[in-house]
C-alpha cells in the first residue's frame, strides 16, 4: 500500500478534509503524486461534499477536475443502498469531446483504487486471473463516456442498458439524446449531483437550449457545481441554471506586489513579443531556439481553421526538422482530431500543436512548456485559457503573444487591466530583413510547387482578416493599421486575395510576383485536368479573364456592407409598393373601396381571434404543467 500523504495542521492536507475522505481516496492521491490539495481543491471539496451548491472560479491548471470528481465519487459511495439499475446518480457535462474524454480518464484512474468499482468498469476476461466478485449490494461507481462522432446514439443506449452506469460524462448534445430514452431514469430518489465543467464556455458555444432541455429532465433537489477559469464573466447567466444559494469559490494568485491580482498560475510566465508583420513567422524559430532547455511540448495558437490548414504546410519548412508539427482544429473529423491529439501528447520528440481555440479550454495536456499566440484571440476571455495550457499543476511554463508594432502594443495595458499582466519576452530577439525575405522565399517555393497550396493560402488569409476585423478590442486591433503587403509576403502569398475590402488598395497586389497563371498547375492530376478543361471551355466561349473579373467585381460587395445594402433595397421596395398601392386605391370606385375595407376588417378580427386562442392554449398548458409538477418552485425557463 502506498504511504499516506503528509498530514498535520495544514488545511491543504488530504486527511484534513471535513467530512473526511475515504482511505482508498487518500491512497489514490498519494499514488498519483498529489501530496497535498491545491487551493481550489481545499476550498471546493469540503463544500461540495457538505451538500452545498458551488460556483468555482480558479486559475487554469489549478486542479478543478479532482475538485468535483472526488465529491461525486464520495457521495455515491456513501449512499444507504446502491442506485437502481438504469438509474443515474451523477452527470458531468463538458463543452468538448477532448475535455470529456480527459475527465473520464481521470475518473477511471481514480476508481482503479476502489476494487468494486474497478471490477465493474473492467470485468475480467481472463479465466486464469479472475477479478474478485462483489455482492450486488456493494456500492460502486460505474461511469460511461458519451461522445458524438465516435459512437451512435443507439450504441450508447445499448452500452447503458448492458452496463447500467450510474455516472455519465458527456458533451451536451449526446447526453440529451440518451436522457430522451424512456429506459434512462433520473428520479429524485437516485440523482445526486450535476457538474458543469468550463461552465461559461458551455453557455458561450450555443448550448443554452440543449442545457435547458437537460435541466428539465433532472430533479430540482440536487447538488450542482459549476467550474471554470472565468465564471465571473458569465455569472448573470449561470446563476439562473437552478442553483440553490450557491457558495462562490474564487481562487486567485498573488502578483509581484503581493496582492491577489492575477488569474493565472504563479508558475506561468506570460510575455509578449513585438514583431513587424513581415517577420512574424520568421520569429517563431528564434523563439523556439531561445527557450532553454528546448521545449518538448509547444502549442501555437492561430485564429482560424483555414489558418491551421495552410500553416501546417508552411511552418515545418520554416522551423526545420527539429520539431514535429501537428495540426488540430474543430472542423477536423472526430477520428482525425483524436488521432492528432494522441500523436501530440504521446510524442517523445519535440512537438508543436498548431491549433485554434478548440484546444484553449479545459484540455489537460501534460507537460506543455511553451505557448505561442501567433494571433491574439478575438475574444479576450480566451487569452487566459490559451496561456493556461502551460504552467499547469505547478509546472513551470512560458507563454508568448505576438503583437505588431504601434497600436497593438496597447494590448499590454489592456491585459493588465484584466489582471493578466504580460512582460517583454526575454532574451531580446533581433530581426533582420534578410531573415524575413528568406522565410518568404521558402514559403513561396512550396506554394509555387502546388496550386492547391496557393488556394489554401488565399482562403486562410481572407479568414484571418475577417477574424481580425471582428476583434472585440477593435480600438487596438484596427484594420486601417494593417500593412497588407508585409502581411501577404509573410504568409508566402503570390498575390493578395480578391477581397472587396481591398478594392481601394493602391499598393502592389501582386506582391512583386510575376507568374504565368494559366500554366500554374495543381499537383493533383485530376484537379489539374479539370482546371485545364475549364480554361479551354472559357477560351472557346470567348469569355476572357478580364470580362469575368469585371462581372465578379460588379457583383461583389464587401461583407461588412451587405446588411446596409439589403436595408436600402428593402426600403426602396416598400416605397415602391406604397406608391403602387396608392395609385391602385385612387382608381377604385367607392363600392370597391368599401369591399376592401370590409375585407381588411375581417382579416384583422380573425388575427385577433387566433392570437387569443393561442394565448388561452399557452395558459392552459402552463397550468397543466404546474399541476403535474406538484412543486411550488419556479420552473427553469432557460438562460435568456
UniProtKB/Swiss-Prot annotation:
Residue ranges of the motif Q motif: 14-42
Domain Helicase ATP-binding per the UniProt entry, residue ranges: 45-249
Residue ranges annotated as motif DEAD box: 197-200
CDD domains membership: DEADc_DDX55, SF2_C_DEAD
Keywords: ATP-binding, Coiled coil, Helicase, Hydrolase, Nucleotide-binding, Nucleus, Ribosome biogenesis, RNA-binding, rRNA processing
Basic and acidic residues compositional bias, start-end: 583-595
Residue numbers binding ATP: 58-65
Cross-referenced SMART domains: DEXDc, DUF4217, HELICc
Subcellular location: Nucleus, Nucleolus
Described purpose of this protein according to its UniProt entry: ATP-binding RNA helicase involved in the biogenesis of 60S ribosomal subunits. Binds 90S pre-ribosomal particles and dissociates from pre-60S ribosomal particles after processing of 27SB pre-rRNA. Required for the normal formation of 18S rRNA through the processing of pre-rRNAs at sites A0, A1 and A2, and the normal formation of 25S and 5.8S rRNAs through the processing of pre-rRNAs at sites C1 and C2.
Name of the protein in question: ATP-dependent rRNA helicase spb4
Gene this chain is encoded by: spb4
Amino acid at each position: 500500500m502506498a504511504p499516506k500523504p503528509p498530514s498535520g495542521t495544514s488545511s491543504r492536507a488530504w486527511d484534513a478534509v471535513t467530512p473526511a475522505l475515504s482511505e482508498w481516496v487518500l491512497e489514490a492521491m498519494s499514488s498519483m503524486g498529489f501530496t497535498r490539495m491545491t487551493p481550489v481543491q481545499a476550498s471546493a471539496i469540503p463544500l461540495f461534499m457538505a451538500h452545498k451548491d458551488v460556483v468555482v472560479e480558479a486559475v487554469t491548471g489549478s486542479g478543478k477536475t479532482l475538485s468535483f470528481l472526488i465529491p461525486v465519487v464520495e457521495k455515491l459511495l456513501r449512499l444507504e443502498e446502491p442506485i437502481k439499475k438504469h438509474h443515474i446518480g451523477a452527470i458531468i457535462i463538458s463543452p468538448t469531446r477532448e475535455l470529456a474524454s480527459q475527465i473520464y480518464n481521470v475518473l477511471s484512474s481514480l476508481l482503479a483504487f476502489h476494487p468494486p468499482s474497478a471490477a465493474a468498469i473492467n470485468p475480467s476476461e481472463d479465466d486464469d486471473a479472475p477479478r474478485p466478485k462483489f455482492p450486488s449490494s456493494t456500492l460502486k461507481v460505474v461511469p460511461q463516456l458519451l461522445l458524438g462522432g465516435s459512437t451512435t446514439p443507439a450504441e450508447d443506449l445499448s452500452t447503458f442498458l448492458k452496463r447500467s452506469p450510474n455516472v455519465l460524462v458527456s458533451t451536451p448534445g449526446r447526453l440529451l439524446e440518451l436522457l430522451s430514452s424512456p429506459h434512462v431514469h433520473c428520479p429524485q430518489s437516485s440523482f445526486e449531483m450535476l457538474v458543469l465543467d468550463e461552465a461559461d464556455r458551455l453557455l458561450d458555444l450555443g448550448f443554452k437550449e440543449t442545457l435547458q432541455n437537460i435541466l428539465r429532465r433532472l430533479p430540482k433537489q440536487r447538488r450542482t457545481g459549476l467550474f471554470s477559469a472565468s465564471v465571473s464573466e458569465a455569472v448573470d447567466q449561470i446563476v439562473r441554471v437552478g442553483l440553490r444559494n450557491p457558495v462562490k469559490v474564487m481562487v486567485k494568485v498573488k502578483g509581484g506586489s503581493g496582492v491577489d491580482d492575477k488569474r493565472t498560475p504563479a508558475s506561468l510566465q506570460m510575455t509578449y513579443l513585438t514583431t513587424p508583420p513581415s517577420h512574424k513567422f520568421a520569429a517563431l524559430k528564434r523563439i523556439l531556439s531561445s527557450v532553454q532547455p528546448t521545449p518538448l511540448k509547444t502549442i501555437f495558437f492561430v485564429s482560424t481553421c483555414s489558418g491551421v490548414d495552410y500553416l501546417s504546410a508552411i511552418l515545418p519548412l520554416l522551423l526545420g526538422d527539429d520539431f514535429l508539427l501537428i495540426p488540430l482544429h474543430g472542423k477536423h473529423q472526430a477520428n482525425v482530431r483524436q488521432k492528432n491529439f494522441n500523436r501530440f501528447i504521446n510524442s517523445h520528440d519535440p512537438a508543436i500543436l498548431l491549433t485554434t481555440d478548440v484546444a484553449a479550454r479545459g484540455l489537460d495536456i501534460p507537460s506543455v512548456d511553451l505557448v505561442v499566440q501567433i494571433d491574439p484571440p478575438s475574444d479576450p476571455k480566451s487569452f487566459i485559457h490559451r496561456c493556461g495550457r502551460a504552467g499547469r499543476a505547478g509546472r513551470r511554463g512560458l507563454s508568448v503573444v505576438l503583437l505588431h508594432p504601434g497600436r497593438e502594443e496597447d494590448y499590454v495595458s489592456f491585459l493588465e487591466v484584466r489582471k493578466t499582466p504580460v512582460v517583454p519576452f526575454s532574451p531580446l530577439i533581433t530581426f533582420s530583413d534578410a531573415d524575413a525575405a528568406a522565410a518568404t522565399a521558402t514559403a513561396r517555393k512550396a506554394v509555387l510547387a502546388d496550386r492547391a497550396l496557393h488556394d489554401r493560402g488565399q482562403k486562410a488569409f481572407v479568414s484571418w482578416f475577417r477574424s481580425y476585423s471582428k476583434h472585440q478590442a477593435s480600438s487596438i486591433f484596427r484594420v486601417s493599421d494593417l500593412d497588407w503587403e508585409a502581411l501577404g509576403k509573410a504568409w508566402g502569398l503570390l498575390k493578395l486575395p480578391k477581397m472587396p475590402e481591398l478594392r481601394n488598395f493602391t499598393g502592389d497586389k501582386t506582391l512583386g510576383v510575376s507568374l504565368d497563371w494559366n500554366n500554374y498547375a495543381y499537383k493533383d492530376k485530376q484537379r489539374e485536368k479539370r482546371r485545364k478543361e475549364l480554361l479551354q471551355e472559357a477560351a472557346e466561349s470567348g469569355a476572357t479573364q478580364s470580362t469575368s473579373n469585371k462581372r465578379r467585381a460588379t457583383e461583389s460587395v464587401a461583407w461588412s456592407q451587405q446588411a446596409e445594402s439589403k436595408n436600402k433595397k428593402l426600403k426602396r421596395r416598400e416605397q415602391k409598393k406604397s406608391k403602387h398601392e396608392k395609385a391602385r386605391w385612387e382608381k377604385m370606385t367607392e363600392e370597391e373601396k368599401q369591399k376592401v375595407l370590409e375585407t381588411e376588417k375581417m382579416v384583422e378580427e380573425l388575427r385577433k381571434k387566433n392570437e387569443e386562442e393561442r394565448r388561452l392554449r399557452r395558459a392552459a398548458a402552463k397550468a397543466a404543467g404546474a399541476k403535474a409538477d406538484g412543486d411550488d418552485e419556479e420552473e427553469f425557463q432557460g438562460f435568456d
